[in-house]
Each structure stands twice: as C-alpha cells, then as structure tokens.
Amino acid sequence: MNNKVLQTLEYDKIKLQLNDFLSTPTGLQEANELQPVSDVDLINHWLAETADAVLIDRLKGGIPLSKLSDITPHLKRLNIEASLSATELSEMSLVLRNTSTIASFFEQMQDEAIGESLRVLPEQAKNLVTLPDITRQIQIAIDSSGRLNDEASYELKHVRDRINGTEQAVKNQMQAYTRGKTAQYLSDPIVTIRSDRYVLPVKAEYRSQFGGVVHDQSQTGQTLYVEPQAVVTLNNKLSELRVQEQAEEQRVLQELSATLAPHTEEIANNVTILGHFDFVNAKARLAARLDAMQPMVNTENKVDLQQAWHPLLDKDLAVANDIALGDGYKAIIITGPNTGGKTITIKTLGILQLMAQSGLFITTKRPSTVGVFHEIFADIGDEQSIEQSLSTFSSHMANIVSMIDRIDDKTLVIFDELGAGTDPAEGAALAIAILDKVASLGAFVIATTHYPELKLYGYNRPETLNASMVFDVSTLKPTYQFLMGVPGQSNALAIAKRLGFGDDVIGAATALTSDADQDLNQMIADLVAQRDAVKQHDVALSEQLKATEKQSEALSEQQRQLEKERAKIVLDAKNEANHIVAATKKQAEQMISEIRKARLNAGQSAGELSEQDLQAKKRQLDGLRQNSSLEKNKILQKAKRAKQLAAGDEITVQSYGQQGTLIKQHSNGQWEVEMGILKMLVDEDDIVKTEATAKAQQSKAKQKQQKIVKTKTASGSARATAKSRLDLRGVRYEAALAELDRYLDTAVLANLGTVEIIHGKGTGALRQGVTEFLRSDRRVKAYHFANANAGGDGATIAELS
C-alpha cells in the first residue's frame, strides 16, 4: 500500500491510538510497523486475533500483561557470558513471571466456556516456554526494585546480619556522644556519614576532646566531621563487612546470569509472543474505545458498510451512513454542493478499508463487509484561493497521472472534487474523461463533484451509480445523510427564496434556468420525496414488528410459566402418590413376610412357595410408583422427546397455536417445521404432537409392549423358581432396573445368599446403572464383578442380606 494514501486518509492517527494501550517495547514496535496488507488469509488471521482479544477483554478484562522493559540488551550481554546487574535481572524476572502468568491464563481458559470460542491466541500461547525453576530462583533472590534479598544466599544473609549488628554498635556508641556530657562540644547532636563512615559534627575548638579522624569540615571551617577514636575500629570492621557483602552480591549475580544464559533464545521468543499479545490487547481496547466491530472479508471486493462513521469523529455526534460498492456497480459519483459531507463520506470508506486490511475492527453499527484491494489511491484536498487555484489544479492532476499507471481491477480509487480548480466546463469534461479512463482499467471508484454535468454520468455509464448528500431546505442545513441512487439536487433557488429574495428575482432566475435543468431538479426532488415516504413507511413497519415481537415474547413467557406451574402440580401429585404407594407397599411386604412365616411353620419348604402369587400384588404396587428422579432427569427427557418426535409427524407449535409438519431435526435442539406455506425453526420444547400422531405412536408402542410382556411372562415364570442368575442383556435401561428390583425381592424371599446379574459390557451404561442400584439397595450386603473367566465386568455378583 502506498504511503501517500495512508497520509491522505490519516491512517497514522488511528495507529497512534494503539499506543495508549501498549505496555511492552515489542508491542509498541509491532504497532508502529503495522501496515494494510492484501493477503486474504493474513487479514482473516489478524481479524481472528483481534476477535479473540476482544472476547478476552470483555469477559476477562484483557490478557494480564505487566509493563515490561526492553531486555534485548540484557540478552545480548548474556550471550557473551557477561554478568547482569540486580536491576537487569529484576527486569528479566518480570518477563519470566509474565510468561508463566500468560501461559497459565490461556491453559485455564481452555477449561472454561470461553475456551471454545477462542480460535487463534491459545495456539500461540502454547509456544511460550516457561522456566519455573529459574523464575522462582530469581524471584527469591531479587525483589521488584532490583535489590538482592537476604535470601539470595546463606553467606549474603550472614554478612548482612553482621553488618546490621556492627552498625547498631556504632550507632549506640555515637549516641553516647550525642546524649552525654560531650554533646556540648557538638554543633548539632546528630550522627551523620562522611566517606561511608559514621562521624560527629564537632565544633572546631573542641577537636581534641574526641581524638580520632577528621573526614570533612563545613564551608566556614567552624565544624569538623570527626570519627571518634572509640568507633574507628567498629567503622573499619563495618567497611570490611561491606566489601564482603559486595563480593557475595557479585557472586550471586554471576551465578544467576549463568543460569539464564543457556535460555536466551527461548526468552527472546517469549518476548516476541508477549509483545504480540500486548499488541492484540491494544487492538481489542481500541475496538472498545471506538465501539467498533469485526468486518467480514469479501474477495470479490463487494464492500457493504452498514451504518458506518469515521473513526476520528465522535460517535455520538457523527452521522452513520450505509455505503456499498462492488455489487452491481463499481463506481459511485456523489454530486451536490459543498459542505454537505461528501468528503467525509469517501474518507470513511477509505479509512475503514485500510483498518480492516490491517486486522483492526471498523466503526459500523451493523455487521459489514469489506473488500481486499491490492492498492488504494486517494486524491483529496479542499479548493484553495484564486491565487493558488492553478497550482492546486496542477498538483491534483499530477497526483492523478501518477496513479493511472498503477491502477488495475484490484484497485480502489477515491477522488474528491474531481476536476475542480479550473474552468467549470473544462473541469467537468476532464472529470468525465478521467472517470472513463479509470473505469476502463477495471478499478473501483468513488468520487465527489459539484459539477452538474456529472449528474447524468451515472445514468449513461455501465456499473456506475449516482449518489448525493441530503440537504434540509427547511432549515438550510445539511443532514450529512448519504443517499445512493439519487444525484445531488440544486437548492440554490429554494435557499435564496427562504432567505428573502422576492418572487420577481426567483422567477427571473428560474426563467434563465434551462428546461432540462429544471426537469432534472424536479425529478430528483420527486425521487427524494418517494425515498422519504418509503423510509417513513419502513420505520412504521419496524415499530410494528418490534411491538409484535414484544407481544409474542410476553405470550411465550406466559406459556412457559403455565407449563412450569403444570409440571409442578403434576410432580407434587406424583410425589404424593409415591408416599401412598410406599406405605401400601410396606404393608404388603409385611403381609408377604407373615404369610411366608405361616407357611413355613405349617411345614412347607421355601421352594414350595408360590412366589408368583406372593409377588403379584407387590408388582402392581411397583407399577404405580411415579419415578420422580427419572422424571426430573433432563437428559432422559431430552432423549425421550428425541425418540418420540420424528420427521413427518403432525404437530402443534404451542407459542403460535398453529399445526404443522416436522421436516427435519437440527443439531441445536430445534426442528424445521412446515406450517402452511411457511417453514421455520422451532425449539423442541415448543412442539406437541397432535392427537392423531400420538394415537398412532401409542398403537405401535402397545403392540411392542405386548411382545415384551410375553417375553417377560416367560422369563418371570422361570424366575419364579428363584434362580440364582438374572440376565438383563438386551433389556432397556429403565426396564432392566425395574426387573432387577423385582428379582431381588424374589431372591430374598427364596433365601438366596448370592445371585449373579448379567448385564454385558456394551457401552457400560447398564453396568453402571446396575452398580448404582446395588450400592443404594438395603437388600444387598456386598457386590463385585465376576471373575475374568466367568464374564469379568460383564456380570456382577451380589451378596444378599
């Protein structure tokens, strides 16, 4: 992309706003080097990065990066085996800690809902190389201010402890001078430092009272800074300890530097990745500041900007417009008077196209589409004074000439006031010739002009559309609204009349205007009036649609509340029934136990008992039980509904009260429903089968149930003799658990100590259900899978109480 268009369209002003959000030198460098590109894949990749960062910024407050220093010089010094200072190591430590933080941040998001929505950045984060041991070692040794901690080494802590003790001894000795009888010999009763040694400010005439060493004197010579003889030895010891401290500090710094040296390449790569994350963070926060959104990219250069405004204008003050180019026409000619907003409109198209091709979000209120232009040219500049008009015209023409040789069918050309600055007749003719030349090269064009001759250009040229800016004659002010398909209307006479010119002047001016011009202006006025009428009708329809949608939502909410209340009533009734059945079942079990004892006392063996007779009533009671836990199971409910509904079913859509036919099921829990001539997607919860469909399915289910009953009757007769094995293979989950419940009753009454339940392996769902059932059943003392040679985990052995 040529640099001139970036300057003309003020691209750098957009880039400079990124700097407000950057915190790393690498991120700042990447922002400074940002340029629009024409590689579609790269543009989409950049936009995907920005989209990820926008989502993270909205849900997580952004990627948690600290303000980092430039550690490139430090890495170079490490590569030549130099030792870093404590401050430099502190800056390295901050980079290492940020690396660990960012890597952990993205790992945690992968386990959250946001992780499924991120497309690009998590993969980049996987390239970060964390050095946890080294990071921890440096963090322990050096604090955030760049000072070596006492914990950096045992020897350093030992030396510093001795320094602290010696300093305290010196201070105690010196305080004896400042508080005792000798205080009268001091200029001030304080202890100060000269040449790294503790001294007293002694009056010159009392020098002999202290002995020791004079290290300095005041400017007047009346005060001498004396190190008393009594503390000379302590100060000497203190100096020696400080030398030891410096030596140990240097040793620690060399050791830490040597630890980092083998990892300079990984750290440099981390710096690049962190800087890039800083850059995409800035793009996301710029999008938030501008209230911008992600554009779609069209490789055929069909541009469709919906409610777009210039990003350098205040959104609350700017007028948003729809701007479309490339779909049916490749040129837009905006005609009309100056100060109506023509220039800002074409600049908006240009700057948003540059932003999108740089991976930045664009300032539109609705989803919009941009093209991918290999080159964008712009000739924009206000008309100058009469004295400068020749030079202005010449510079514009020179600029256009330089474009012509580089224009092709992948180029967007922007002209502002084409042909201005010279004789109007020649300027209009030249403008038409230039537009024809650019069109012959296949370029996409948007141009502004106030020449009336170009109003007919859009009607006489293929793939060309007229446009204008709306002017409110009643207020004599431009509205800055962009109107496509209608050329600019001349409002000079209307404005003159409103400003007070008499009918004689207006009439004379009208008479001097050609009939063609009057007809054209009248045609434009009629088109504008029709557009306004259609727009008002559209607004009315939109308001009516919103009211209808609001009413529909209210009815849907009312329906949901009714369904919730109905479900609660049914559930309460079922729970009450369960309590009654449980009490009755307990009585029945007690009666069965008493009958069994009576028969045993009468001399009958357990094997002679008619278990079918004893269990008949109990099974009837079991059948009455309403399994509230299964009713509450949303997964089972969804599975049941999915099995109950099928394509071709006649159904009723509850929210509309309309009958229809199911066409096909979609993966998002919705069905495609045909209602008369309409086809629409409806939530599965909103669908109820019609009575005819339900009866047909009940008939099929009844026939199937009769087959199952016959099978179970034969199986039940076999189990009546209380066999020690129950085979549940091929039985549906719920039916299998009910059958297991009945079998355990039979086995307990038959005094069976151990039973075998065969459930097979399959998906493991039935095996897990049997295991859960046995775990919570009081009749089961213990259970385990069968031996490997006896079925393994395809069968469970249960020991009964």
Swiss-Prot record:
Its EC number is 3.1.-.-, 3.6.4.-. One of its GO terms (molecular function) is ribosomal large subunit binding. The keyword DNA repair does not apply. ATP binds at G336, P337, N338, T339, G340, G341, K342, T343. Residues 696-721 are annotated as: Disordered. GO terms for biological process: mismatch repair; negative regulation of DNA recombination; rescue of stalled ribosome. Coiled coil: none annotated. Pfam families: MSSS, MutS_V, Smr. The keyword Nucleotide-binding applies. InterPro entries: DNA_mismatch_repair_MutS_C, DNA_mismatch_repair_MutS_core, DNA_mismatch_repair_MutS_sf, MSSS, MutS, MutS2, P-loop_NTPase, Smr_dom. Keywords: ATP-binding, DNA-binding, Endonuclease, Hydrolase, Nuclease, Nucleotide-binding, RNA-binding, rRNA-binding. Residues 726-801 form the Smr domain. Residues 701-710 have a biased composition (Basic residues). Endonuclease that is involved in the suppression of homologous recombination and thus may have a key role in the control of bacterial genetic diversity. NCBIfam families: mutS2. Homodimer. Binds to stalled ribosomes, contacting rRNA. Belongs to the DNA mismatch repair MutS family. MutS2 subfamily. HAMAP family: MutS2. This is Endonuclease MutS2. The gene is mutS2.
